[in-house]
Amino acid sequence: NDGERQIVYGWMSPFVEPIPMQNDGWCGNLTLPREITLGADGDLHTAPVAEMDGLRENTTDFGTISLGVNGEQTIADDAEAVEIEMTIDLNASTAERAGLKIHATEDGAYTYVAFDDQIGRVVIDRQAAAQGDRGYRTAPLSAEELASGELKLRVFVDRGCVEVYVNDGRQAMSSFSYASEGPRAIKLVAESGTLEIKSLKLHTMKSIGLE
């Protein structure tokens, strides 16, 4: 830090037993380092530090994507550590919920990162997660954000957790996500309607060497 930035870490720890990581001798983990800034709207914004871009390796640019009613498209067959940047066209989409199923395994388990149009919130839904807490997290969008007609999501996924940054850090959510054994796919989905994606990039992330 050069003294010009305010950087924080969050602490993630599960509180509902059984705790899957106990068997591996772990107890929680830190979030990504985040820079706190004051937005033009007067609110505090929190987004990953710029140095995170240096961990990107291979990038797949999907460009624009259109999904039909209840459509689904796999964007990664087996993802361990990835970053996803996507912009949803809210005006052109009709889905009640749409987003990403992460840690999607052959047994049908997954964690769902989605925009719920019925409540105007971005959600992390773990009801179908393979293990651990089935908790539900939400981040409300302001009237201004909803009226803008687009939603920007930056989603980080690794082996055991997910972090979601909404509209350049106006909201941030972190959650554990324990997958089943086997390949962990990422799927783009639309529920009860269509989905229009203005842009979507998937970056694989290299390790920082703490294994």
Located regions from the model:
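Beta-rich accessory regions
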Residues: N1-E211
